[in-house]
């Protein structure tokens, strides 16, 4: 579990300079990632509720709603919402791409797109909650979830 970088102290001729730039950059990136994680959970909750009842196949299929997942990439610092095509011990989600984009005999439903576009105001509120905490360092540190840095916890 990485800790935020400590302040850099430079002493010269009795004058001590303290730089918190690295710590501020760390808090900004981690708050951004925490905001993206909560936005993804909110949007996918709506998507999964919409997918469950579209037809008899998805009602019966246990994995129908869990195929929609999110990925938060560390280096790029962005959020991807999408459909994972395979899972351990399950068949492929051949129907998910067709129901999202449309195909012959399958109407375009656009679960992801409509969930995001219909809830832009709520997404802004969620992100504002995290990004307004930048001003207060103690509040920001409490919002950052250090356990998220484990790679096996990234897919929910």
Predicted regions and their residues:
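Hydrophobic alpha-helical transmembrane segments of polytopic membrane proteins
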Residues: 91-95
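Short, Lys/Arg-rich flexible segments
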Residues: 1-88, 98-156
């Amino acid at each position: 579990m990485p800790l935020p970088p400590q302040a850099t102290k430079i002493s010269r001729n009795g004058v001590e300079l303290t730089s918190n730039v690295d710590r501020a950059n760390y808090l900004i990136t981690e708050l951004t990632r925490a905001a993206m994680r909560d936005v993804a959970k909110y949007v996918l909750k709506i998507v999964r509720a919409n997918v469950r009842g579209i037809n008899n196949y998805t009602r019966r299929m246990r994995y129908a709603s869990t195929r929609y997942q999110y990925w938060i990439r560390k280096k790029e610092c962005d959020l991807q919402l999408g459909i994972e095509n395979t899972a351990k011990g399950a068949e492929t989600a051949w129907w998910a791409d067709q129901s999202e984009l449309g195909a012959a005999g399958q109407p375009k439903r656009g679960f992801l797109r409509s969930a995001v576009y219909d809830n832009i105001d709520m997404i802004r509120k969620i992100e504002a909650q995290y990004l307004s905490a930048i001003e207060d360092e103690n509040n920001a540190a409490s919002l950052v979830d250090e356990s998220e840095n484990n790679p096996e916890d990234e897919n929910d």
